[in-house]
């Protein structure tokens, strides 16, 4: 799936997604956060903005330092250190805590609903050939 999204802020996001393509860039392979998948250490997502870019999940923040962003200026990465844990174990522990009433859900039903609305909007836009507003 390839899609372009315009956000409320005016930012434009370009997304290319596949759960079928064989590659080292799958989220679980990149993070190595579970022993179920062999770690490649490759980034699966890149966020690029006017002043900086972020590789994810390796968390290298690329920027021009104190200089104005420009192709002629040196751009350097600053690593952001983060210790990863087994995501599946953390998710099930959190789910159990939510069920027991010890903590609120990190992702709410409203978040899930919006994810579904967005997914359905992508399918509608692709099948109908027009932009879908959310």
Regions found by a protein language model. Give the residues of each.
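A short, polar/proline- and glycine-enriched secondary-structure boundary/capping micro-motif
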Residues: 24-29, 65-71
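A generic "alpha-helical surface" signal
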Residues: 45, 86, 90, 110-114
């Amino acid at each position: 799936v390839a899609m372009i999204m315009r956000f409320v802020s005016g930012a434009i996001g370009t997304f290319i997604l596949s759960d079928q393509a064989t590659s080292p860039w799958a989220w679980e392979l990149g993070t190595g956060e579970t022993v179920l998948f062999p770690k490649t250490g490759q980034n699966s997502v890149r966020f690029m903005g006017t002043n900086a870019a972020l590789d994810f999940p390796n968390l290298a923040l690329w920027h021009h330092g104190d200089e104005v962003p420009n192709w002629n200026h040196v751009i350097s990465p600053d690593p952001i250190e983060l210790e990863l844990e087994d995501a599946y174990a953390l998710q099930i522990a959190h789910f159990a805590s939510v069920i027991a009433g010890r903590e609120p859900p990190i992702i709410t039903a409203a978040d899930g609903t919006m994810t579904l609305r967005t997914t359905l909007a992508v399918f509608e836009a692709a099948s109908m050939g027009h932009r879908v507003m959310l």
